[in-house]
C-alpha cells in the first residue's frame, strides 16, 4: 500500500467518516480511529475540537491541500461579501483540480491534482499546470488531445456513474467542460456533511 493511500485511510479513520466516498475506506469496516488507542470511547468534542475536525475534513477532501493555501482561502473568504462559509466553498470549488474532478475526467481529487500538475489540461485553450489555479465562470476546461487515451482518463470514462453538478457543463465525448457559475454549499456533491462556517470560526479564534 502506498504512503498516499495509507494517509487517506488514516484521515478517514481519524475523522470516523468516509470523506471521499471510497468503497475501500477503512471506516466502512470499522469506525474507530488509527493507532493503538483508536478504539477508546470518544467523548463529546469541545467547540475547538468540532471546528478543528471541520477544518481537517474540508481541507483533506481537496486532496489535503497545504495549510498555507487553506489559510489564504480563509483570508479571501472573509474579505469577500456575503457568507464567509459559502465563500470558502466557492473558492475551493473554483480550483482547477476540483473542476477537473467534478467534470469526471478522472476518478479522484488526488488523481485530478496529478493530472493538472503533469500538464494534461488546458483552460480557454492555454495549458495550465497549477492545481490551485482559480477558474472563473465561463472558462472552458479541456483535456489535451494527446492525453485523452491515458489510462487515468479511460478508467474514469468507464465509471458507471458520471454525475456532474449543475454548475459545470461537461461533454465527455470531447472531454471539455464549462464552469458556468460559483456553486453554493448545498449544490456541492460532498459524500459527507461539510461545515465551512465551523472552519471560519476555527481561523477566527
UniProtKB/Swiss-Prot annotation:
Disordered: where is this region? 15-48
Q: Kindly indicate where the leader peptide sits in this chain.
A: none
Q: Which UniProt keywords apply?
A: Ribonucleoprotein, Ribosomal protein, RNA-binding, rRNA-binding
What's a GO biological-process term for it? ribosomal small subunit biogenesis
Q: Name one GO cellular component term.
A: small ribosomal subunit
Q: Which InterPro entries match?
A: Ribosomal_uS4, Ribosomal_uS4_bac-type, Ribosomal_uS4_CS, Ribosomal_uS4_N, S4_RNA-bd, S4_RNA-bd_sf
GO MF: rRNA binding; structural constituent of ribosome
The segment(s) forming the S4 RNA-binding domain are 94-156
Tell me its family: Belongs to the universal ribosomal protein uS4 family.
Q: What does this protein do?
A: One of the primary rRNA binding proteins, it binds directly to 16S rRNA where it nucleates assembly of the body of the 30S subunit. With S5 and S12 plays an important role in translational accuracy.
NCBIfam families associated with the record:
PRK05327.1, rpsD_bact
Q: How does it assemble?
A: Part of the 30S ribosomal subunit. Contacts protein S5. The interaction surface between S4 and S5 is involved in control of translational fidelity.
Could you identify this protein by its name? Answer: Small ribosomal subunit protein uS4
Q: What organism does the record attribute this protein to? A: Methylobacterium sp. (strain 4-46)
Amino acid at each position: 500500500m502506498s504512503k498516499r493511500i495509507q494517509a487517506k485511510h488514516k484521515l478517514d479513520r481519524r475523522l470516523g467518516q468516509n470523506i471521499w466516498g471510497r468503497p475501500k475506506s477503512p471506516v466502512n469496516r470499522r469506525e474507530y480511529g488509527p493507532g493503538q488507542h483508536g478504539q477508546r470511547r470518544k467523548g463529546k468534542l469541545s467547540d475547538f475540537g468540532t471546528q478543528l475536525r471541520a477544518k481537517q475534513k474540508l481541507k483533506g477532501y481537496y486532496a489535503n491541500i497545504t495549510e498555507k493555501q487553506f489559510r489564504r482561502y480563509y483570508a479571501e473568504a472573509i474579505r469577500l461579501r456575503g457568507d464567509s462559509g459559502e465563500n470558502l466553498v466557492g473558492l475551493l470549488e473554483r480550483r482547477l483540480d476540483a473542476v477537473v474532478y467534478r467534470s469526471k475526467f478522472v476518478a479522484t481529487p488526488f488523481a485530478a491534482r496529478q493530472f493538472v500538475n503533469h500538464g494534461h489540461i488546458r483552460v480557454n485553450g492555454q495549458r495550465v499546470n497549477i492545481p490551485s489555479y482559480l477558474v472563473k465562470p465561463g472558462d472552458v476546461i479541456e483535456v489535451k488531445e494527446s492525453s485523452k487515451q491515458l489510462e487515468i482518463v479511460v478508467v474514469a470514462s468507464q465509471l458507471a456513474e458520471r454525475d456532474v453538478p449543475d454548475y459545470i457543463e461537461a461533454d465527455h465525448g470531447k472531454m471539455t467542460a464549462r464552469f458556468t457559475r460559483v456553486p453554493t454549499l448545498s449544490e456541492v456533491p460532498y459524500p459527507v456533511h461539510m461545515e465551512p462556517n465551523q472552519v471560519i470560526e476555527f481561523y477566527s479564534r
